[in-house]
Amino acid sequence: MSSRGVRAAGTDGNDFQNRQRIAQHYQESAQYKSVLKWFFVPHFLILVFMWLKVGSEFLRYNFGWKNAFFERLDMPAAYPWEYVWCLSFIPIVLALSSFQRNKLKVLHYAYYAEFICGIFPCMIGLGGQLPELLEYANDMEGSNTPTFKGIFPMVIIWYIFFAVALQIHGFSMYFMHHLAAAWAPVKRD
């Protein structure tokens, strides 16, 4: 749509650039949402394996359910922190539900749930498994550490899990914090 008459005085027609830029906080919001979704993928994959481990044990001991596959794996009993970590799907659900309308309060709930259901159980597991790790490191042949399929020590598997899970939870909290900062209203002095 063109205007009638001559061009406005003092412009050469190149003053549209300021209207074509997207505000920085919108760019950051889209970027952090995308990154968080990518962190939720490995978190959910690990969560599925943990649900299988803990769920099979729960069904076996409480309902007498038997499955040849899980019996062949010869997994040790689940620790209490594993049951709490299985609730770490809650921050994923909260964060994803906050994305559509940029609900800051729901994102804050997801942030704190990430700590309570994700990092806190992992830290308890780290501390609880430390004596077992030290025992295994000092005497690999004579230690009584539970094994996976009778071969590989579970304490090593747990510490690999802790390394991966703590990074996923830590980076998720980091990006949730920055996403909340992008969504927060600007404070005027």
Curated annotation (Swiss-Prot):
Residues 1-34, 97-105, 172-189 are cytoplasmic. Keywords: Endoplasmic reticulum, Membrane, Transmembrane, Transmembrane helix. The keyword NAD does not apply. It comes from Caenorhabditis briggsae. The chain crosses the membrane at residues 35-55, 76-96, 106-126, 151-171. This is Protein jagunal homolog. It is found in: Endoplasmic reticulum membrane. Residues 56-75, 127-150 are lumenal. Belongs to the jagunal family. Its main location: endoplasmic reticulum. The lineage of its organism: Eukaryota, Metazoa, Ecdysozoa, Nematoda, Chromadorea. It comes from the Eukaryota.
